[in-house]
Amino acid sequence: MKHAEMTGQIIGIIPARYGSTRFPGKPLASILGKTLLQRTYENSLRASALSDLIVATDDERIFEHVRSFNGKVVMTSEQCPTGTDRLAEVLSLYPEWMHATAIVNIQGDEPCLNPLTINLAVQALVNDPQGQVSTIVTPLLDEEEAKNSSIVKCVMDQQGNALYFSRALIPSNKTNSFKNGAIYFRHLGLYVYRPSFIINYQKLPSTPLQLEEDLEQLKVLEHGYRIKVAIVDQANIGVDTPEDIHKVEEWLCKQNTFL
């Protein structure tokens, strides 16, 4: 882990909860001899943009596990309603990080996340001195995925700022049909924030579109902040259910890059 050609500290934080409706104990699930969380942590360390990396958890089992592989970890409250709230608590425990250039929120169930994707998301915010948030999207070419309400879509302006996020098919047309050749983008759950924005975000009231779509990022847009968007070639294989473990193992074996 080293500094890329960027100014100031870039801190990566991996929020990790033991409880999960679809997959209890997910962070400690085994993937080819290492846990999901360890693979995510070690893979994230390969991102040259990061100056530091820490796991934020409310569970003693996860805390001890991260320490067992010499990772950096901090205990946070069980009362944090969202991952963003957990980031804010970490900043209260490490006040010196309030002076960092950016904080990267890395999902704990992304063991296949390309470290270059982290770098790209960070660079998008660093290149926008007035920006507060950046994120990642990837082209969406499959009609079934494009119409899947579990997959969040994004449309952007010509400057690479998010215009809207939706569970519906966007952009749409008069017949609400998938159009081959149209540009659809899938939103990936990686965010980069200015430290001060994380604190301010907690104070912002919920907004109508955020509540209707059940998408936190819409609160950012509805309150007038912009989200800078970077584009990557393809999505990563995340782990939502126990069945996804096999997909990740197959991918790792094919890549043979960080077994």
Swiss-Prot record:
UniProt superkingdom: Bacteria
Keywords: Cytoplasm, Lipopolysaccharide biosynthesis, Nucleotidyltransferase, Transferase
Database matches in CDD domains: CMP-KDO-Synthetase (cd02517)
Keyword flag Flavoprotein: no
Record field: catalytic activity: 3-deoxy-alpha-D-manno-oct-2-ulosonate + CTP = CMP-3-deoxy-beta-D-manno-octulosonate + diphosphate
Any GO MF annotation of the entry: 3-deoxy-manno-octulosonate cytidylyltransferase activity
GO cellular component: cytosol
GO biological process, one term: lipopolysaccharide biosynthetic process
Cystines in this chain: none
Record-linked Pfam families: CTP_transf_3
UniProt-annotated location(s): Cytoplasm
Coiled-coil ranges from the UniProt annotation: none
EC nos: 2.7.7.38
Function: Activates KDO (a required 8-carbon sugar) for incorporation into bacterial lipopolysaccharide in Gram-negative bacteria.
Family: Belongs to the KdsB family.
Name of the protein this chain belongs to: 3-deoxy-manno-octulosonate cytidylyltransferase
Lineage: Bacteria, Pseudomonadati, Chlamydiota, Chlamydiia, Parachlamydiales
